[in-house]
Design a protein with these regions (language model features):
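Tandem CBS (Cystathionine beta-synthase) repeat/Bateman regulatory domains
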Residues: 1-149
Length: 149
């Protein structure tokens, strides 16, 4: 199973929209967008629409709140993650999860050359692995005391 499988599944559920914001936007604007769309990360782009970085909930907490910065006056370019790790659509889910684990990321950008396909979260990848685990999802829900158990 590959990252493309996850992107297709997100598309089937109407969750494949790629949300971007310019690096010159404020942290407050980014947080507003993230809240509006109930997402945990935004792709940050340059004025030329090139990938500049990624801005995540963790960036808000560790680089803005913890540092005592004013979200209304702080541009994303100062606090976004610039060292973006990415996967291609053909990357296996296991390899993507390993990359997330090693680099402590919850989100990965999906790129193929200069073409930006989207973002996948650890939750998106885990859901697909569990969903295709031939009944393991139901067993995991029962063990966790989830709904219907």
């Amino acid at each position: 199973m590959t990252v493309m499988t996850v992107l297709q599944a997100l598309g089937d559920r109407g969750m494949d929209q790629l949300y971007t914001i310019q690096a010159s936007a404020s942290v407050a604007e980014a947080v507003e967008e993230m809240g509006k769309y109930d997402i945990g990360a935004l792709v940050v782009s340059t004025e030329d629409r090139l990938l500049a970085g990624i801005f995540t909930e963790r960036d808000v907490m560790m680089r803005v709140v913890r540092a005592g910065l004013d979200p209304r006056r702080t541009p994303l370019s100062l606090v976004m993650t610039r060292d973006v790790h990415f996967v291609t659509p053909g990357t296996t889910l296991e390899a993507a999860l390993a990359l997330m684990y090693v680099h402590r990321h919850r989100h990965l950008v999906v790129m193929d050359g200069p073409h930006l396909h989207g973002i996948v979260s650890m939750r998106d990848l885990a859901y697909q692995l569990i969903r295709h685990g031939e009944g393991r999802f139901e067993a995991a829900v029962r063990l966790a005391g989830g709904p219907g158990t």
